[in-house]
UniProtKB/Swiss-Prot annotation:
L-serine binds at residues 237-239, 291, 391. It catalyses: tRNA(Ser) + L-serine + ATP = L-seryl-tRNA(Ser) + AMP + diphosphate + H(+); tRNA(Sec) + L-serine + ATP = L-seryl-tRNA(Sec) + AMP + diphosphate + H(+). The lineage of its organism: Bacteria, Pseudomonadati, Pseudomonadota, Gammaproteobacteria, Enterobacterales. Belongs to the class-II aminoacyl-tRNA synthetase family. Type-1 seryl-tRNA synthetase subfamily. Catalyzes the attachment of serine to tRNA(Ser). Is also able to aminoacylate tRNA(Sec) with serine, to form the misacylated tRNA L-seryl-tRNA(Sec), which will be further converted into selenocysteinyl-tRNA(Sec). It is an enzyme of class 6 (ligase). This is Serine--tRNA ligase. It comes from the Bacteria. GO terms for molecular function: ATP binding; serine-tRNA ligase activity. GO terms for biological process: selenocysteine biosynthetic process; seryl-tRNA aminoacylation. Pathway: Aminoacyl-tRNA biosynthesis; selenocysteinyl-tRNA(Sec) biosynthesis; L-seryl-tRNA(Sec) from L-serine and tRNA(Sec): step 1/1. The keyword Transferase does not apply.
Length: 430
């Protein structure tokens, strides 16, 4: 959520920045709403003051033994006008808030202006894609040959875009998540958290999934519990519960940065992606991810973005998977992001790089929604924190990359060196 003071006092500058990311801000509507809000604010304050004055006059008249009925009727009439003005002001303020919640974050000045992924800028590459002297198989064929990926069973159990993993493939999937968590907690300084996979609507508003992206979520309403508290949604990413841990909190400055990580399943309806990536593990309704979140002081957040992205890169480097780092343009960034790097891993069967991590600085956009603040240790004033998040990594897509990049001519998969301690020393699977 953008700073309301910016929307009031720097509207043209805000509109220009939003236009860079293809968002047209209706400046005239906002101006009209703000003018009407000021009028109603003055009107309610004036009516309140007048009613208070008349109420005092009633007391004085009563003490003098005068007839107070005319004054009482006047106070009642003022009260009705005040209630009507307050109701109109509340309605208008809700409309202003709803509009503010629909406005995306402002892009940082370092973000390239563009319309879509074609305008993203490649920052760097790491590793060289391997040359094969045999026909490369995709991860679906390799997983099925190993008896470890069963999409038909998942269709029977649930439906499309789900998978059942078995045996050595399931073990490698588990090994990847354990390796990632150990790296982030032991080497990168993150605190591991176990979080709920179901969250309430306040949590989803806090990180920006609601109200705009409700159709992307799986919503639940238990039949046995008819109450407001039973309107939960499955998390689309651990960013949601991890970041909301600081909602309505005031942190001490010395506790920052706060670095959190969690391994969770993630659930997405994939609305609007019909027909895309229908084969395999690339785009699933349920997938595992190790998420990283940082809560920082405003002046530290851009450096934290570089650090957090580097932590995701380290996973790929230790797995020896070729990848490239891409700076997203204004038209390709997520709703709440001020600046985003994507990491794209090389997939031999597709002969291209595919996204495996997205690392974003959300600036104070989420913090304002959550009222997440810290207390400055010098002046003891409270300020909004900055929030950052990144995949470290998407476990299923990392499994895809390992299967394809480490495949052998006979269909076996070589186990990356860093995973062998998690797999009982196995050198090959399949």
């Amino acid at each position: 959520m953008l700073d309301p003071n910016m929307l009031r006092n720097e509207l043209d500058a805000v509109a220009e920045k939003l236009a860079r990311r293809g968002f047209k801000l209706d400046v005239e509507v906002l101006r009209q709403q703000e003018e009407r809000r000021k009028v109603l604010q003055v009107e309610t304050e004036s009516l309140q003051a007048e009613r208070n004055s008349r109420s005092k006059q009633i007391g004085a008249a009563k003490a003098r033994g005068e007839d107070i009925e005319p004054l009482r009727l006047e106070v009642n009439a003022l009260g009705e006008k005040l209630d009507a003005a307050k109701a109109e002001l509340d309605k208008l303020q809700n409309e202003i808030r709803d509009l503010a919640l629909s406005i995306p974050n402002l892009p940082d000045d370092s973000v390239p202006v563009g319309k879509n992924e074609n305008d993203n800028i490649e920052v760097s590459r790491w590793g060289e894609p391997r040359k094969y002297d045999f026909d490369v198989k995709d991860h679906v064929s390799l997983g099925e040959m190993a008896g470890g990926l069963d999409f038909a069973a998942a269709v029977k159990l649930t439906g499309a875009r789900f998978v059942v993993m078995k045996g050595q493939i399931a073990r490698m999937h588990r090994a990847l998540s354990q390796f990632m968590l150990d790296l982030h907690t032991e080497k990168h300084g993150y605190l591991e958290a176990y979080v709920p996979y179901l969250v309430n609507h306040a949590t989803l508003y806090g990180t920006g999934q609601l109200p705009k992206f409700g159709e992307d979520l799986f919503h639940t309403k238990p039949l046995a519990e008819e109450s407001d508290n039973s309107n939960y949604a499955l998390i689309p990413t651990a960013e949601v519960p991890l970041t909301n841990l600081v909602r309505d909190e005031i942190l001490e400055e010395d506790s920052l940065p706060l670095k959190l990580t969690a391994h969770t399943p993630c659930f997405r309806s994939e609305a609007g992606s019909y027909g895309r990536d229908t084969r395999g593990l690339i785009r699933m309704h349920q997938f595992d991810k190790v998420e990283m979140v940082q809560i920082t002081r405003p002046e530290d957040s851009m450096a934290a973005l570089e650090e957090l992205t580097g932590h995701a890169e380290k996973v790929l480097q230790l797995l020896e998977l070729p990848y490239r780092k891409v700076l997203l343009c204004t038209g390709d960034m997520g709703f709440g992001s001020s600046k985003t790097y994507d990491l794209e891993v090389w997939l031999p069967a597709q002969d291209t790089y595919r996204e495996i991590s997205s690392c974003s600085n959300m600036w104070d956009f989420q913090a304002r929604r959550m009222q997440a603040r810290y207390r400055n240790k010098t002046d003891r004033k409270t300020r909004l924190v900055h929030t950052l998040n990144g995949s470290g990594l998407a476990v299923g897509r990392t499994l895809v990359a390992v299967l394809e990049n480490y495949q052998q001519a006979d269909g076996r998969i070589q186990v990356p060196d860093v995973l062998r301690p998690y797999m009982g020393g196995l050198e090959y699977i399949g």
